Amino acid sequence: MTKVKKEECEEVPETPSKSYDELLSYLNPVAKPLAGRKLTKKLYKCVKKAIKQKNIRRGVKEVQKFINKGEKGIVVMAGDTLPIEVYCHIPVMCEDRGIPYSYVPSKSDLGAAAGSKRPTCVILIKPHEDYQEAYDECLEDVQALPLPY
């Protein structure tokens, strides 16, 4: 075994991130209400701000546990999660407790916004005074989305 010099190694090009329209082709039939392009961007920014304050719940088990305990916030779910049975009960729980929820197109982008290398399918953003303005803006926009009846 020999060492390979740096000059000889080919650089692996970064995979370009897919556009919003490309991500829409991978959606589940359950992913409604889906956040638009601008709202998706706002939600990702709000998640990034919430991560800095450690004011976030990540993952199906953790989000489900804290929704049952009565914690309030905005639930953001990835629309490309398969199988659907993993998280199809979360919207019903949110509606029963009056918690606004929305879907975004990509679980890998949601995980990246949460500062994780792993994809994340459900996130609960809790309110905090440091990013209250961004949170209120997202809350207003998510509540304005039509419910899928």
UniProtKB/Swiss-Prot annotation:
Please indicate if the UniProt record lists rRNA processing as a keyword: yes
Chief localization class? nucleus
Keyword Transcription regulation assigned to the entry: answer is no
Could you tell me where this protein is found in the cell?
Answer: Nucleus, Nucleolus
Q: Name one GO molecular function term.
A: box H/ACA snoRNA binding
The superkingdom of the source organism is Eukaryota
Which cellular component, as a GO term, is one annotated location? sno(s)RNA-containing ribonucleoprotein complex
Q: Which UniProt keywords apply?
A: Nucleus, Ribonucleoprotein, Ribosome biogenesis, RNA-binding, rRNA processing
Q: Output the PROSITE patterns linked to this UniProt entry.
A: RIBOSOMAL_L7AE
Q: Which GO terms describe its biological process?
A: rRNA pseudouridine synthesis; snRNA pseudouridine synthesis; telomere maintenance via telomerase
Under the heading InterPro entries, the entry gives: eL8/uL1-like, H/ACA_rnp_Nhp2-like, Ribosomal_eL30-like_sf, Ribosomal_eL8-like_CS, Ribosomal_eL8/eL30/eS12/Gad45, Ribosomal_eL8/Nhp2
Query: Can you state the subunit structure given in the record?
Result: Component of the small nucleolar ribonucleoprotein particle containing H/ACA-type snoRNAs (H/ACA snoRNPs). Component of the telomerase holoenzyme complex.
Q: Which family is this sequence assigned to?
A: Belongs to the eukaryotic ribosomal protein eL8 family.
The role this protein plays is: Required for ribosome biogenesis. Part of a complex which catalyzes pseudouridylation of rRNA. This involves the isomerization of uridine such that the ribose is subsequently attached to C5, instead of the normal N1. Pseudouridine ('psi') residues may serve to stabilize the conformation of rRNAs.
User: Which protein, by its recorded name, is this?
Assistant: H/ACA ribonucleoprotein complex subunit 2-like protein
Q: Which organism is it from?
A: Xenopus laevis
Highest classification ranks of the organism? Eukaryota, Metazoa, Chordata, Craniata, Vertebrata
